[in-house]
């Protein structure tokens, strides 16, 4: 492991949180008592919130940026060990960030056993592994400029296949159970490629990756409408992803990134149908105004986030699925003007709020209203849940998990970013950015 100095402030002690929670206890209890009297089954909702965990991607811990520039916040994690420590801090604060998702080759560990131990010390598990064939690496023999798994050159496809299999191997070493494949493969101009052959090449390549999966693993095929290719993307929408996963087999699932749709797509309907087909694998949560903006979850379209969770809760309950374990939950955001850790705390909070609101929907009343096509009543039932302030339930879940009633306030009170800059430097850049 690297010899970078430890930052004690990152390892907030229980007494720090206890002092903070004590100061807020009376006000919190008043709010909790009120909302508990308003929402039937609030105790069961809190129990589900305590169990719910959202993975943090390693690449979200540093400042993101755009093609026009990047403005570092300083103190960014310089290696996988520091990334684990940062996510451990988030989990200590909110009790709901108990998993880390690695991106290879950025996060290749020199000592996988030591990494597993470090993660366990912070109460973290390893979520999906992410491969990278959308950019060329320094030691790479062949280029992905014109695609990877779709490439017209079989040698390039073979290189990309071998990379994905290597990512699986690394994941096995640290205890991950899934692989996410996002491809930038596509074209920028009409006539650049044959759509059918590109699909067939990609499917053939994915089949070789699929064959390397351990029996208890899943592969998630992530789709995106456009960018970096702007005329066509070879896994461009949920229908194409569903085609791939259906042809691959029962261990293959579609992954939904909220920002990977065309504007105003009905994501909640997509979610419902993928659940119906037993092909929904997981989520990358973020928010957007125009494209794949990767903004803080719930910052632009909180009602849409609630509607998505409404379909998730209904669909998962209809199939007897575990909310905690049967889908992959992850944030995928880029932070250009915010402190990345503060942004992640906000995103987790927004996701938990939307989940709690969906759990509070009067399902029996909604089904009854739907059965007689009472459109007004259906809308009222959903908006009653959405407009109810469930933040005391989310805060109580944190309290029961041993975390902070107000994570962001604790983060700022102990000046965590200032301490990170002091120990890591003002000009550090997180790997992968």
Regions found by a protein language model. Name each.
Residues 106-115, 149-166:
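Glycine-rich anion/phosphate-binding loops
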Residues 217-228:
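Aromatic-lined carbohydrate-recognition surfaces of secreted/lumenal glycan-active proteins
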Residues 4-65, 69-71, 78, 88, ...:
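Histidine-acidic metal/acid-base catalytic patches
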Residues 68-69, 137-158, 183-196:
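Surface-exposed, active-site-proximal loop segments in enzymatic domains
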Residues 49-61, 104-139:
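Glycine-rich, aromatic-flanked loop segments that form ligand/cofactor-binding clefts
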Residues 11, 65, 70-71, 77-120:
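Basic, amphipathic N-terminal segments that precede the first structured/catalytic domain
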Residues 122-131, 150-158, 198-212, 238-247:
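Acidic, His- and aromatic-enriched active-site or binding-groove loops in soluble protein domains
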């Amino acid at each position: 492991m690297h010899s970078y100095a430890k930052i004690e402030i990152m390892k907030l002690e229980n007494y720090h949180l206890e002092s903070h929670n004590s100061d807020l206890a009376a006000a919190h209890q008043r709010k909790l008592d009120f909302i508990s009297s308003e929402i039937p089954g609030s105790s069961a909702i809190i129990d589900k919130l305590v169990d719910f965990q959202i993975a943090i991607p390693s690449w979200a811990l540093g400042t993101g940026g755009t093609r026009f520039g990047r403005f570092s916040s300083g103190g960014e994690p310089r290696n996988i060990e520091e990334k684990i420590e940062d996510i451990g801090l988030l989990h200590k604060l909110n009790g709901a960030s108990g998993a880390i998702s690695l991106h290879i080759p950025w996060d290749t560990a020199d000592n996988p056993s030591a990494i597993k131990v470090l993660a366990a010390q912070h109460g973290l598990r390893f979520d999906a592994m992410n491969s990278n064939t959308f950019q060329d690496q320094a030691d790479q023999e062949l280029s992905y400029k014109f695609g990877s798994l779709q490439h017209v050159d079989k040698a390039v496809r073979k290189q990309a296949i071998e990379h994905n299999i290597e990512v699986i191997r690394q994941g096995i070493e640290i205890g991950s159970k899934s692989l996410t494949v996002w491809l930038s493969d596509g074209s920028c101009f009409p006539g650049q490629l044959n759509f059918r052959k590109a699909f067939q090449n990609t499917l053939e390549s994915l089949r070789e990756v699929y064959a390397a999966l351990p029996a208890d693993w899943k592969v998630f095929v992530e789709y995106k409408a456009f960018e970096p290719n702007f005329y066509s993307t070879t896994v461009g929408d949920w229908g194409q992803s569903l085609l791939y996963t259906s042809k691959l087999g029962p261990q293959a699932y579609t992954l939904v990134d909220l920002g990977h749709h065309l504007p105003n797509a009905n994501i909640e309907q997509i979610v419902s149908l993928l659940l119906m087909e037993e092909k929904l694998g997981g989520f990358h949560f973020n928010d957007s105004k125009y494209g794949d903006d990767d903004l803080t979850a719930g910052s632009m379209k909180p009602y849409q986030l609630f509607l998505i969770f409404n379909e998730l809760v209904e669909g998962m309950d209809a199939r007897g699925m575990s909310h905690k374990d049967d889908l992959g939950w992850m944030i995928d955001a880029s932070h250009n003007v915010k402190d990345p850790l503060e942004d992640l705390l906000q995103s987790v909070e927004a996701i938990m709020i939307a989940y709690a609101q969906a759990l509070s929907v009067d399902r029996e009343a909604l089904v009854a209203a739907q059965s007689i096509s009472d459109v007004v009543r259906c809308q009222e039932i959903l908006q009653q849940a959405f407009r109810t302030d469930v933040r005391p339930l989310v805060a109580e879940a944190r309290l029961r998990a041993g975390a902070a009633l107000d994570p962001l306030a604790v983060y700022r009170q102990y000046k965590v970013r200032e301490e990170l800059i002091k120990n890591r430097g003002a000009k550090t850049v997180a790997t992968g950015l």
